[in-house]
């Protein structure tokens, strides 16, 4: 009975949207909070801080969307080019492709007769799928989706960027830097933990690594803000 009810959920199925979501939200938090902290540390008033933060949100979301779309599109183009070439080779030289698939399975540990049998059966069922998966290394579960990655990155960036802006609105004017920094570090810890948990990694490690880099980014921009604030 346990065999019949057994099912597995693999983390690799989530890798496309998970990568874009975590990267987008993390970047939105860190970049916008760092911008707010830097401008506030320079002695700017609340309206200037909010304008800078809102501009950073819009520009960052668009940049993330464009960057993810271009990056993933390039990956997709490469995959499609390889698949097109494999399709042509399967049509023009099927025996050579069968031999190639057989050698692939022999290299993985099967004896030659069994490898030939496996290659033949998989070719009869779905030749292109077998070659794409076992020769080119392009499994269907991780095929790139440019539009999905772009939309997820832009949306999650905006969600992450909203957090420091809300704090900048609500915090006392003289303590915007402190409130934004503390809230952002807490949000980064939660985000890192959730991302690590969704990906099957350690929660503490995931939380600590994003918190460290977020703190470093805010410290650097605060230093820049204080330097120019003093000069001004």
Give residue spans per PLM region.
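Structural signature of hydrophobic alpha-helical transmembrane segments
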Residues: 174-187
């Amino acid at each position: 009975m346990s065999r019949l009810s057994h099912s597995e959920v693999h983390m690799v199925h989530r890798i496309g949207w998970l990568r874009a979501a975590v990267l987008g939200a993390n970047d939105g938090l860190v970049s916008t909070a760092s911008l707010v902290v830097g401008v506030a540390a320079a002695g700017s008033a609340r309206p200037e801080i909010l304008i800078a933060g809102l501009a950073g949100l819009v520009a960052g979301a668009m940049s993330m969307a464009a960057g993810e779309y271009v990056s993933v599109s390039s990956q997709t183009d490469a995959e499609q080019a390889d698949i097109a070439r494999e399709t042509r080779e399967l049509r023009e030289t099927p025996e050579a492709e069968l031999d190639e698939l057989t050698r692939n399975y022999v290299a993985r540990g099967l004896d030659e007769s069994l490898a030939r049998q496996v290659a033949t059966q998989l070719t009869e069922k779905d030749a292109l799928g077998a070659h794409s998966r076992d020769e080119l290394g392009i499994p269907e579960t991780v095929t790139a989706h440019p539009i999905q990655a772009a939309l997820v990155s832009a949306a999650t960036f905006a969600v992450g960027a909203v957090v420091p802006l809300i704090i900048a609105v609500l915090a006392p004017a003289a303590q915007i830097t402190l409130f934004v920094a503390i809230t952002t570090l807490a949000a980064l810890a939660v985000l890192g933990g959730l991302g690590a948990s969704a990906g099957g990694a350690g929660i503490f490690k995931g939380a600590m690594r994003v918190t460290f880099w977020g703190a470093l980014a805010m410290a650097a921009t605060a230093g820049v803000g204080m330097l120019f604030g003093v000069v001004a």
